[in-house]
């Protein structure tokens, strides 16, 4: 048997070894696999991180490379554009050089070949010189001048602006050459006549020799020119001047025109002594002469001055050297071409009509010859350069041109020759180009002029040179614009300039045609502009007037009447100056008057505002008026707002209970504070608004006083309700309020008592004038109290009267006597917040209010006047009052159970009674416990307690008489459903309201008691409501207590139990029997114990304190027996005993206590 067992063990051991080995291997493999996996993961994470970094680096590098490539491409594009521009400029420069070389070659050939032709043309001018003398006074024209072009020899401007002009210039040149060739007559077919014309065309582009220019500018001689008339061919085309005119109109700006001079215009090289280069002068075929600013030449027929250059002289010499058969045709064409070239120099082009530019077979062209004159006239020439005159075309000039053409046709050549011979006789013959004699006999220049023409030349030359000065000044003044100077006709500066003689218009005015208006432009500097034009409107008006009068003057006088014209213009300008200054002065005076009137009106309005406006003072926006009135208004309004709190008299009490009305004093102080704010002001102006508001507030105060007088006790009690606002700082201290005691309501009219009270309050105010007003918080709290009191005063007073009447009607003569002896005062319940828990039937609020009113008005006591002497005054008494009533369970709203009774407490010689409100959770139920004949059962009702903040607040309770039999007072707890109906005067959120009843007057006489009885009997007849209301009359203290009240025992006290249930955070309302010797002070907190301080004269009061439960309750049980010590009132005692058992069963209500501690205490 052992063998198999051994065998099994060996097998199992082997199996176990194998299994263990396999397990170890698998574990090793798993561990290795996990390690490998971990390594792989680590490596992969490392790889991922490295790849991310590499990717980022590559992306950055790629972005950089892209940016570099973009930059390179942009630079490449810019370089390509620059290369293209440079290539274009190179090609342009090559073209310029080529054209320049061609022009130089042409100029050289022209200078060498065309000199003799110009001399021949100048010799032919003698025969056609006198044809223009017939229409001397009818063909006057204004000289047209142009600014010189300062172009050096062979200068080429290589700017991009002129690139497009070169081709146009070349085309224009070829057109002019073709036109010149085409205009030759068919009769002259020789190429010799065409070659000089082309050479002359090239000569126009050339420059004169240096030596001639030096002689012309340096010699100081003035060359006067005479015209040579050349008849053009009949086959001359009419379209050629029109085309040339269109080319002139479409010519570019003056800067571009200077560029064209190098291509197709006559140029002069500025060199040596010459200040300005001379420019070619050529007259139009319509007899319209043009003058260069360099020199002045006078046409003796027209009366104009013009200056010609040496280049014109040489052209004339070249024209004279031409063959006779072909000289007439190309010369006219050359003159035409020269006119086109010279017109391009003018910045202000002259506009011609197409009819004026047409050439006919009878039109005569002029070529100018040069002669020498005096040296002193060259100085005037230098002053009159660089000037351009604008030629204005008039309607009459066209007619004169036509008449001059007709006269030129009929003009005789003989008269011209005779005048030329006379001129030669008077003046010596001059040699062209400053040389001695001409090589050709026909080259004698026609310098013979008549003496009459010579004198007219001098006169017109002087006038024209002076006029150029005037035009130069005017042009400079006109173009000096914008910020520094302003142009306006007939300014003060211009008149002064005329008077100083800087230029004399009598001798220097330019001659105008009869139809041309004169126009002057003057400069006004900034220093004068402010004086002349104070206002922009005046400036516009004056400028309009001057523009209207600017065209008033038209020169309808001849040349000899220029002085009169000048005088007339000067006088007109002076008159205009006076009128302008008068208008300026008038406008200034008017504006000043308007401003003064406005300011005066504003001042008067301000005075009216200060005098009449009682509410707002609007200060106008002037610098001379102060801006303090608004601040005064705001300060005054602030003071008045602070004084709004005193609209109704606020009465406050101190330790002595004295009162003070703060309203009047604060209002009077307000008048003193307001003048102190701004002593420099008139007090009457500042205090107007406060006075008005103070008057309104005084009316309000008087209205309130009247209301208090009319409404009777309500307002007086309203004032009295605030007496305790300051007493809350003194808990436990009872004040003597005897001075506030009001007499009994012995009169039918209750207003008398209110008047008495008002007088008493005023006396108190006088009694303590130094008292400080209460803080603002107290006044605000008083306001809230007063607001709520006003709403509830009438209801409370009415219900009080009803209850008094009901009580008087239901009771017998005993109760009537009680009413006679009691000082009745109405109680004002002041509630800050009504407890919001309303009963399910919805009528709890009304019923609670009415119940509260019933309790407040129906608790009375009786004081036996015969027993006053038996009691000593008690120091600091605190009467604990318990007011109870029972709400009928079957009635809702204001209906009350018929079993409700009034609890009467008898007080002897007590000055104050304090009522402390109970919490909403406090419930009283009558305990139907077995009581002996010595026990008294107090049948209370549900009550609404009013809050009293301090135990020092004084309350008086009317006392009722009762028989010698003591009554048993049992505290009664109400059910929870009725608890909600109690509108308590003190909620957890608020501090509670104060209830005040004036104490009884202990010294009332019997007569006053009988008058009271009559009053109450009348009230009972008027208002009767519930007959079941009755007061429970307790046994008076005078019957139970003996004369040795200080050593009182159980027999000297009224045997009654005073159980009170007290909740947290609430003050207590305690009821004590007729004994006033005990003073109880209760302070109730959430977790604090109540302290009960009982007087030393109540040793038999027993305090019971219930610890279980969250709420602490105090039960005061007075176990003292009642001893009948007053046999003088047996009737009262018997009536009290008989009335009390009758209502005991109706007042018994089963206990409904939620807390067992309170139930057990109440059963005790």
From Swiss-Prot:
Keywords: Cell cycle, Cell division, Centromere, Chromosome, Chromosome partition, Coiled coil, Kinetochore, Meiosis, Nucleus, Phosphoprotein
Residues with Phosphoserine modification: 1042
One GO CC term, this protein: kinetochore
GO annotation terms (biological process): cell division; chromosome segregation; female meiotic nuclear division; maintenance of meiotic sister chromatid cohesion, centromeric; male meiotic nuclear division; meiotic sister chromatid cohesion involved in meiosis I; meiotic sister chromatid cohesion, centromeric; positive regulation of maintenance of meiotic sister chromatid cohesion, centromeric
Keyword Cell division recorded: yes
Biased composition annotated in UniProt, kind: Low complexity: 182-198, 1112-1125
Residue ranges, compositional bias (Basic and acidic residues): 390-412, 525-541
Top-rank taxon, per record: Eukaryota
Biased composition (Polar residues): 238-247, 288-299, 443-472, 934-948, 1126-1140
InterPro entries referenced in this protein's UniProt entry, alphabetically: Shugoshin1/2 (IPR038889)
Gene disruption phenotype: Mice develop normally and survive to adulthood without any apparent alteration. However, both males and females are infertile. This defect appears cytologically as complete loss of centromere cohesion at metaphase II, leading to single chromatids, and physiologically as formation of aneuploid gametes that gave rise to infertility.
Location of the region described as Disordered in the Swiss-Prot/TrEMBL record: 160-269, 287-314, 390-492, 521-541, 917-992, 1092-1164
Coiled-coil residue windows: 62-113
Predominant place of localization: nucleus
Tissue: Ubiquitously expressed in proliferating cells. Highly expressed in the testis and oocytes.
Family: Belongs to the shugoshin family.
Assembly notes: Part of an astrin (SPAG5)-kinastrin (SKAP) complex containing KNSTRN, SPAG5, PLK1, DYNLL1 and SGO2A. Interacts with CDCA8. Interacts with PPP2CA.
Further facts: Shugoshin is Japanese for guardian spirit (as it is known to be a protector of centromeric cohesin).
Job of this protein: Cooperates with PPP2CA to protect centromeric cohesin from separase-mediated cleavage in oocytes specifically during meiosis I. Has a crucial role in protecting REC8 at centromeres from cleavage by separase. During meiosis, protects centromeric cohesion complexes until metaphase II/anaphase II transition, preventing premature release of meiosis-specific REC8 cohesin complexes from anaphase I centromeres. Is thus essential for an accurate gametogenesis. May act by targeting PPP2CA to centromeres, thus leading to cohesin dephosphorylation.
Name of the featured protein: Shugoshin 2A
Classification of source organism: Eukaryota, Metazoa, Chordata, Craniata, Vertebrata
Record gene name: Sgo2a
